Amino acid sequence: MSRYSILIDVNKCNGCYNCFLSCRDEYYGNDYPSYSAAQPLHGQFWMQVHEIERGVYPKPKVSYIPKPCMHCESAPCMDAAKDGAVYRRDDGIVMIDPEKAKGQQAIVNACPYRVIYWNEEKEIPQKCTLCAHRLDEGEKEPRCVESCPVNALVFGDLDDPESEIARLSKSLETESLRPEFNTDSLVQYVGIPKHFVAGEVVYKGDEGECAPGVKVSLTGGGLNLETVTDLFGDFEFEGLDKNETYKLVVSAEGFAENTQEFTTFKDVNLGEIVLDPK
């Protein structure tokens, strides 16, 4: 028995929207009997791409989070459905029967991820099917995965130890998008944005000369990290937990250590950190 899933690496996603566009191309105006009815022209995003703005000037960032149906093993939509209108295939894919689901708007309301949509014209709920019709025809992956130019989406069988997705799931730190929902989602993520701290180091005097190659260490929240400033004296630490207090130490030979403490109520820009000669 298989458990098909997608592993989404947020670190790789560049927001090209190929996944969204290829999904629309596959489903808009196209019926796949027993699998799905055609998407309407407006209002449905079976593969959403969320743009997350992070940080503050002059250290802003943008992250992109692709978001399909999570194909949950404890799917609230299945509990809300009547007459078997939502079911799980033997390969783990959660499907909505377009005929049995007619009139069942409760299926839409049951999804905590908000990835099930109501087709007003046809009066049915609709969502991502992981291109089950393609898989059953012998294709190896959904359209969204096939069209990703940076390999941010990896599809495969989680129960096949030889599959790429199984190997990556073991070697990387994967997580659910919203673990507090307790839905045991098959779709997993790498690199969901947390908080980050950034700053720039300069030497006192010399008109604020950049300080490249300077050691910067960070402790707190169970972390003990170290980096060096780049050619412009900039540094950054990613993956910091919310509402944690951290200590940052900047040290360079011949200069006094500079210590900063901060709490991650949000992303932090420490600005210019000046190193004084000893």
Outline where the language-model segments fall.
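Short, acidic Ser/Thr/Gly-rich low-complexity loop/linker segments typical of extracellular
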Residues: 221-236
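Short, ordered, surface-exposed loop/turn motifs in non-cytosolic proteins
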Residues: 195-197, 204-221
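A short, solvent-exposed loop/turn motif at the edges and junctions
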Residues: 249-261
